[in-house]
């Protein structure tokens, strides 16, 4: 069966739904960017979602594979996602990965140590529980949301520029 889809293989089309085969282990960057996808069905064995793969679509909800370890830069930016739950296997989310969605809620993996720059910027988040293992939050990671309070984990050593700018934070 199909094991890999190349870079930009199906970009700039009018695809609405994609069912990825169980044999698939690699999806090239921007493979499905700039379509009209509302649904994606992931294979269980997929561990990495590369840069920009689903950028500029119409995704509203996602069920990520349970073994996913990495989400690349801009992988799901500019969609219509309203909530996200991340598998415990996930340790890294690339810059701008979920920027420009409609997220009101995210459930982060407890194993996540780094949140990249702009990851959740320009959404509608009202609250977020940061994992205890988190050590770094990138520039503007949560900028332009609707957060009213945030509890910083003890192990956090680095908060980037404007990480929480343009929110409604009243408590920290």
Annotate each PLM feature.
Residues 1-4, 13-26, 36-48, 58-70, ...:
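Structural signature of tandem-repeat unit edges
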């Amino acid at each position: 069966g199909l094991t890999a889809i190349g870079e930009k293989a199906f970009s700039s089309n009018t695809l609405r739904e994609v069912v990825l085969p169980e044999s698939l282990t690699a999806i090239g960057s921007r493979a499905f960017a700039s379509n009209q996808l509302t649904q994606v069905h992931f294979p269980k064995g997929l561990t990495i979602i590369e840069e920009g793969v689903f950028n500029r679509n119409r995704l509203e909800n996602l069920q990520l594979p349970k073994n996913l370890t990495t989400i690349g830069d801009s992988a799901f930016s500019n969609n219509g996602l309203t909530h996200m739950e991340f598998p415990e296997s996930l340790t890294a989310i690339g810059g701008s990965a979920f920027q420009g969605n409609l997220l009101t809620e995210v459930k982060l993996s407890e194993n996540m140590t780094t949140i990249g720059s702009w990851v959740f910027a320009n959404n509608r988040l009202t609250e977020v529980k940061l994992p205890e293992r988190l050590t770094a939050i990138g520039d503007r990671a949560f900028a332009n949301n609707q957060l009213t309070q945030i509890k910083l984990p003890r192990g956090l050593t680095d908060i980037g520029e404007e990480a929480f700018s343009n929110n409604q934070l009243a408590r920290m």
